[in-house]
Amino acid sequence: MTLSEESHLPKHVAIIMDGNNRFAKKNQMQKGDGHREGKNSLDPIVEHCCTRGVQALTVFAFSSENWNRPAFEVDLLMKLLEEAIHEQLPRMRKFNIALRFIGDRSKLSEHLTDLMTHAENETAHFTSMTLTIAISYGGMWDITDAAKQIAKDVSDGIVDIEQIDTHLFGRYVSLNQLPPVDLLIRTGGDYRLSNFLLWQAAYAELYFTETLWPEFSIDEFDHALAVFAGRERRFGKTSEQIQQDKIEN
């Protein structure tokens, strides 16, 4: 089989876009310039995912923990996020991509949340791919929020407590209308998930690279896809069972 075959291509790719500040320091730039370079690095990856046939791309733009950064950097990141949304809309129309956002919107400015809602509404009918940007997001927040929603539905008589299982719980977390994450890529050299998509990436293949996000290229993205294609995904089964399933199917 070739990499281009659907069985070898991840349906859902997630990326922790790490390394902007280190890129700026490495190149004797201001922090803001590093983040701006990182913003620009997303565009070719989005287009490439769409042309390759990836169904969903989810990127970590601003975490729950990022609120702890210096105020000037948070303000800069919020401004860049607004710029990115404005810049992405024409690309979404051109490539027929739906744009979505996940995260705790209660901490965001009204202007930014209105812009996010507008972008979602403008692209809701596009079907080639779904690009999701995680802003003010944390996996633990996501799971806790889902638990609160379930508790309310139990209290309101909508859900019986005996109905609660992983399938039902999964309907309450973010990205519940998308396939589970197949491949999670982290740039920047750290080897951790940093509280990103803890539920959705439970069975994801992980690809870590020392490459800083502003330097992450389409060639390395394709290498990550090739690594993914070479892995055997067992989901608790043995290799023998997987081989037998392939024969039978």
From Swiss-Prot:
Note on how the cofactor is bound: Binds 2 magnesium ions per subunit.
PROSITE patterns: UPP_SYNTHASE
Entry's EC annotation: 2.5.1.31
Molecular functions (GO terms): ditrans,polycis-undecaprenyl-diphosphate synthase [(2E,6E)-farnesyl-diphosphate specific] activity; magnesium ion binding
Enzyme class, UniProt record, top EC level: transferase
Sequence positions that bind Mg(2+): 18, 205
GO process annotations (BP): cell wall organization; peptidoglycan biosynthetic process; polyprenol biosynthetic process; regulation of cell shape
Cofactor(s) the protein needs: Mg(2+)
Gene Ontology CC entries for this record: cytosol
Catalytic activity: 8 isopentenyl diphosphate + (2E,6E)-farnesyl diphosphate = di-trans,octa-cis-undecaprenyl diphosphate + 8 diphosphate
Binding residue positions for substrate: 19-23, 31, 35, 63-65, 67, 69, 186, 192-194
Highest taxon, organism lineage: Bacteria
CDD domains: Cis_IPPS
Active-site residue list: 18, 66 (proton acceptor)
Alphabetic keyword roster: Cell shape, Cell wall biogenesis/degradation, Magnesium, Metal-binding, Peptidoglycan synthesis, Transferase
InterPro entries: UPP_synth-like, UPP_synth-like_CS, UPP_synth-like_sf
Quaternary structure (record): Homodimer.
Family according to the record: Belongs to the UPP synthase family.
Record PANTHER family: DEHYDRODOLICHYL DIPHOSPHATE SYNTHASE 2, DEHYDRODOLICHYL DIPHOSPHATE SYNTHASE FAMILY MEMBER
Protein function: Catalyzes the sequential condensation of isopentenyl diphosphate (IPP) with (2E,6E)-farnesyl diphosphate (E,E-FPP) to yield (2Z,6Z,10Z,14Z,18Z,22Z,26Z,30Z,34E,38E)-undecaprenyl diphosphate (di-trans,octa-cis-UPP). UPP is the precursor of glycosyl carrier lipid in the biosynthesis of bacterial cell wall polysaccharide components such as peptidoglycan and lipopolysaccharide.
Protein name per its UniProtKB record: Ditrans,polycis-undecaprenyl-diphosphate synthase ((2E,6E)-farnesyl-diphosphate specific)
Species of provenance: Acinetobacter baylyi (strain ATCC 33305 / BD413 / ADP1)
